[in-house]
Amino acid sequence: MEPAPLILLAAGGTGGHLFPAEALGVVLMQRGLRVRLVTDSRALRYSGLFSREMTDVVPSETVRGRSPVALARTGAMLGAGTLKALTLMWRLKPAAVIGFGGYPTLPPLIAARLMKIPTLVHDSNAVMGRANRFLSAHVTAIATSLPGVLDRDPALAAKTTTTGTPMRPAILAAAAVPYAAPEPDGPLRLLVTGGSQGARIMADVVPHAIEQLSPELWRRLVLVQQVRDEDMARVRAVYDRLKLNFELEPFFSDLPARLASSHLVVSRSGAGTVAELAAIGRPSILVPLPGALDQDQFANAGVLAKADAAIRIAQHDFTPARLAQEITALAADPERLTAMAAGARGVGRLDAAERLADLVVEVAGIPAKTMMYQ
């Protein structure tokens, strides 16, 4: 009996790339297909669907400058990665290779193209990332989380399907928890997160914003905040002095459940975060990461802001006074919080993993009879 077709999932080594790949992998395995992950060494830190036995690490390099030395280093690493990926394709013979963005996806997708293996890229951002943009003209098909991402290019738009962002089972479970607005005198559960690049600004601004809230709000507040180890002491000192009910951690392994139990979220606006806020349906205050060439986080936050589901604050406007003002206004208006939660849910797509799996099967040309639905 021949083994089931293999789908190779290629993703950069951060959660924003890995989590959608994991969510798709779960659905493909439920359909009786085999999956493997191709990524860079950063992904080995994540626990999840992909064990080390299911993961192949391919050399790659992010473009970090335009100097001749930087470009030569990047080119050499991508060349070495592509050679290794070609060997991998020859050995594994995947039915299709699916990319989820990040420079580590370039070698496997280029190798698949050279070997005439069907390819697809998925992009979760409102503005397509640079690696996916480079690959988009060469792949068999494109999937996006949001509509209209490639409307300015008719050739790319013609092979693009809007699927949404695949969600892990933990997110789908959290999405089943309905939003319950805070009672006027009851607890106000505030979740503050920002990822490795965003937690520093949250540590700089949020404690001083909390200081400016009323004593009544201090008594109501149940605060959960992601804080880097190096910022922990100074943040804790402020909250201890205010006698708050708070919890600080550098990383929350149960973040989906934390999102589900929150009344309001303060966060960066990476594609994964925005998609999870939409799927679970929670109001948010979003602070896009500045300086990105494509301003992708600004555009991502704009999707929820346009749906009246989030308040978007540029980092130069993200001051303690501004944040305190927004928290105070929302805490006094549970009806607005409820409307924001509903607006977020209106953006979310809970069936995205199934929709993307359908597209993968189509691109790979896998007959329905070869699959076994579990």
UniProtKB/Swiss-Prot annotation:
InterPro entries: GlcNAc_MurG, Glyco_trans_28_C, GlycoTrans_28_N. HAMAP family: MurG. Its main location: membrane. GO terms for cellular component: plasma membrane. The gene is murG. This is UDP-N-acetylglucosamine--N-acetylmuramyl-(pentapeptide) pyrophosphoryl-undecaprenol N-acetylglucosamine transferase. One of its GO terms (biological process) is regulation of cell shape. GO terms for molecular function: UDP-N-acetyl-D-glucosamine:N-acetylmuramoyl-L-alanyl-D-glutamyl-meso-2,6-diaminopimelyl-D-alanyl-D-alanine-diphosphoundecaprenol 4-beta-N-acetylglucosaminlytransferase activity; undecaprenyldiphospho-muramoylpentapeptide beta-N-acetylglucosaminyltransferase activity.
